[in-house]
Amino acid sequence: MRKLWSSTVPGKDRSADIIFHFHQELPKLLRGYHQCTKEEAAILGALIYRVKYAETKADISSCLKSLIPSDLAKIMSSHEWKKEIARAYNKDSGMSPDEAKIAFLKVIYRWPTYGSAFFEVHQVSDPSFPEHLIVAINKQGVNMIHAQSKVL
């Protein structure tokens, strides 16, 4: 099931955040559609880890692909990612998985691409645009995003 929204504020409707919004936004982050810093990625990775494993101390390195955006995976070694995610995870000790979902949404809510529907586009007609684009459609309109740099 998919929920469409145009004026959602994380935390305002906890049930919708926990049931719909988190699960709709997570794959968009992991596919690398949003412009995200490595610091934000580590924080979000820790929140995703908490959603999946709560307080269980499983091995972070074995599940990195499900914690960080695909386009950022190679900017640090697995060991460095594990260290940064563990650091962020330890800062939020005692947070429940549902609270982690809302905290995740509050981070990405600040981004101009929050709540977008994304489309990967291969274009050949306009040489002033890159060959590979991501088209993001949200309440602010239609955005053309460079697939590698994530610049709007």
What does each model-identified segment do?
Residues P27-K28, Y33-L152:
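N-terminal recruitment modules of adaptor/scaffold proteins
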Residues M1-P10, I18-H21, K28:
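Cationic-aromatic interfacial patches
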Residues I19-H23, A41-A42:
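Non-catalytic, well-ordered alpha-helical scaffold segments
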Residues P10-S15, Q35:
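Conserved, non-catalytic sequence blocks in retroelement Pol enzymes and Pol-derived host proteins
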Residues D17-I18, I134:
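Generic detector of ordered secondary-structure context
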